[in-house]
């Protein structure tokens, strides 16, 4: 029964990830695409956690942390690009 619930949850997460990919492709504005990319990162973390529970292993926990860090850095970089038009500033006024 528990395995069935995990498989259903994996299916739901896969469908929502697919819908977010459509939002990234068709998104009317760039901020919509950024939010969809962030949600894809969160879904990947959840899918990895569900697979880890399903396989009864803790081997994927490092991958979950890595995906979380990369998703956070990507969101910050996109936000900075939307705000200033560049990610890394060459001219800094000190």
From Swiss-Prot:
In which broad location class does this protein mainly occur, judging by the first location in its UniProt entry? membrane
Localization annotation: Cell membrane
GO-annotated biological processes? sodium ion export across plasma membrane
Q: Which GO terms describe its cellular component?
A: plasma membrane
Check the record and name the Pfam families matching this protein.
MrpF_PhaF
What are the GO MF terms of this UniProt record?
A: sodium:proton antiporter activity
Question: Does the record bear Oxidoreductase in its keywords?
Answer: no
- Keyword annotations for this protein? Antiport, Cell membrane, Hydrogen ion transport, Ion transport, Membrane, Sodium, Sodium transport, Transmembrane, Transmembrane helix, Transport
> What InterPro entries does this protein's entry cite?
MrpF/PhaF-like
How does the record classify its membrane topology?
Multi-pass membrane protein
Transmembrane residue ranges: 2-22, 34-54, 59-79
Superkingdom of origin:
Bacteria
Q: Outline what the protein does.
A: Mrp complex is a Na(+)/H(+) antiporter that is considered to be the major Na(+) excretion system in B.subtilis. Has a major role in Na(+) resistance and a minor role in Na(+)- and K(+)-dependent pH homeostasis as compared to TetB. MrpA may be the actual Na(+)/H(+) antiporter, although the six other Mrp proteins are all required for Na(+)/H(+) antiport activity and Na(+) resistance. MrpA is required for initiation of sporulation when external Na(+) concentration increases. Also transports Li(+) but not K(+), Ca(2+) or Mg(2+).
- Which family, according to UniProt? Belongs to the CPA3 antiporters (TC 2.A.63) subunit F family.
Further remark: Mrp-dependent antiport apparently occurs by a secondary, proton motive force-dependent mechanism, but the similarity of several Mrp proteins to membrane-embedded subunits of energy-coupled NADH dehydrogenase complexes raises the possibility that there is a capacity for electron transport that could provide a primary energy coupling option for Mrp functions.
Q: How does it assemble?
A: Forms a heterooligomeric complex that consists of seven subunits: MrpA, MrpB, MrpC, MrpD, MrpE, MrpF and MrpG.
User: Would you tell me the protein name for this molecule?
Assistant: Na(+)/H(+) antiporter subunit F
């Amino acid at each position: 029964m528990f395995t069935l619930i995990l498989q259903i949850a994996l299916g739901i997460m896969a469908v929502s990830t697919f819908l977010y990919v459509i939002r990234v492709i068709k998104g009317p504005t760039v901020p919509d695409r950024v939010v969809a990319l962030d949600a894809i990162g969160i879904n990947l973390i959840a899918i990895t956690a569900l697979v880890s529970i399903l396989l009864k292993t803790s081997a994927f926990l490092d991958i979950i942390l890595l995906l979380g860090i990369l998703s956070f850095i990507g969101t910050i970089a996109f936000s900075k690009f939307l705000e200033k038009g560049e990610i890394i500033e060459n001219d800094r006024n000190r």
